[in-house]
């Protein structure tokens, strides 16, 4: 299957794929969910939950980075961080892979479409815990949402298998993000509807357009199995399949893509020779220092202690999560497991951990912890480790964007 065919497989299914850039109302302060009471969602129907969204800013009359990258005029734009010649069309036009701009949610009790092992992207801001099923994101790549009062873009790039969440607030604006139809290093390139600046999904930096050089703030995302997230957040919210689009949710439009012997689509750089292109790694970056933890090492050890920019971390792995990029049905995908990265400190006391029965036990108190860093039994029950931003991705992508990355070795 060609790269264009793969990308188009995730595109039209009843819609024409044309960009839809609606003028929004005046910018204002973010609207917290549920009219300021995010702990008590408003239920509109059994299982369905109503959440309020931030007010997005108006479209601005500025030169378009999106147009420039597609062969248009570049007059009036700052020097791009990435030569437009390095951007590749994935096939679909802008928003041909349609983002979800008006997300609907269901309660945990209302979910009947996820298997225990299906991957969900977990976000928790101020106790507002949400799960975004990869079976939905694989078809849309971006959800413009508001979580814990923060306007958030929850993003997923299938070609890099990378999940990242970004604050949509930029210079007093609240942005709305779409898919540009372009790729850089085989990774999703987003654009904002307010200025049509292009942004790298992988590092959150504006690369072509009026906001070139601006960086988005990130929030931690963990890709975990539905069963683990459900048990940890019985009162949480789950992105609904009621997206307004006709897609075959639960199926994988990129079957076989994650084969270790395959090559990434539309990646024209040289792959760092330390691993093959499609080797899975956990990527961590703190203050410019980067570390890749190979998944094979995590499979062997379960827990890998790490230090990045002087910060001690603990990196975890448990089995039980299906690959979304393997079989035609996501639920049938190979068990690649799931990861978590945390600061291993509680009340100033450093902890070390040992894998145990699908969770972890700290060696200091004997408390049991789940994959989301919550103590579920023992003296520290109810405590939460500080999560650290990380990305589960392929080596070709991590090493392309972080060429100076170190690699974790066996303990």
Task: Briefly describe each language-model feature range.
Residues 13:
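Short, conserved catalytic or interaction motifs in soluble domains
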Residues 17-411:
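Mid-to-C-terminal functional-domain signal that highlights helix-capping/loop sites
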């Amino acid at each position: 299957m060609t790269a264009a065919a793969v990308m188009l497989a995730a595109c039209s299914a009843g819609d024409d794929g044309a960009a839809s850039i609606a003028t929004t109302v005046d910018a204002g302060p973010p609207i917290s969910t549920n009219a300021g009471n995010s702990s008590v969602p408003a239920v509109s129907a059994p299982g369905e939950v109503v959440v309020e969204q931030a007010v997005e800013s108006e479209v601005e009359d500025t030169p378009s980075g999106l147009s420039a990258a597609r062969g248009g005029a570049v007059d009036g734009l700052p020097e791009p961080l990435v030569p437009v010649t390095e951007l590749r069309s994935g096939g679909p036009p802008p928003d041909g892979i349609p983002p979800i701009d008006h997300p609907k949610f269901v309660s945990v009790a209302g979910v009947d479409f996820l298997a225990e092992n299906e991957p969900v992207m977990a976000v928790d801001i101020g106790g507002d815990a949400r799960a975004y099923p990869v079976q939905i994101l694989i078809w849309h790549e971006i959800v413009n949402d508001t979580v814990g009062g923060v306007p958030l873009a929850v993003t997923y790039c299938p070609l890099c298998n990378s999940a990242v969440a970004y604050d949509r607030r930029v210079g007093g604006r609240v942005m709305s993000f779409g898919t540009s139809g372009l790729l850089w290093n085989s990774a999703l390139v987003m654009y904002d509807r307010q200025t049509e600046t292009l942004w790298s999904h992988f590092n959150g930096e504006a690369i072509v357009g009026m906001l070139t050089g601006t960086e988005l703030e990130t929030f931690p995302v963990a890709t975990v199995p539905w069963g683990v997230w459900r048990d940890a957040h019985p009162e949480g919210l789950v992105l609904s399949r009621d997206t307004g689009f006709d897609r075959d949710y639960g199926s994988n439009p990129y079957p076989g893509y994650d084969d270790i012997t395959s090559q990434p689509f539309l990646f024209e750089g040289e792959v760092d020779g330390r691993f093959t292109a499609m080797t899975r790694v956990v990527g961590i970056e703190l203050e410019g220092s980067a570390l890749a933890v190979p998944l094979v090492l995590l499979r062997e050890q379960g827990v890998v202690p790490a230090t990045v920019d002087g910060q001690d971390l603990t990196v975890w792995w448990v089995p039980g999560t299906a690959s979304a990029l393997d079989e035609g049905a996501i639920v049938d995908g190979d068990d690649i497991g799931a990861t978590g990265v945390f600061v291993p400190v509680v009340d100033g006391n450093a902890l070390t951990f040992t894998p145990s029965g699908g969770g972890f036990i700290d060696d200091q108190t004997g408390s049991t912890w789940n994959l989301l860093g919550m103590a579920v039994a023992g003296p520290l029950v109810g405590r939460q480790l500080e999560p650290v931003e990380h990305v589960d991705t392929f080596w070709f992508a991590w090493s392309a964007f972080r060429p100076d990355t170190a690699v974790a070795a066996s303990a």
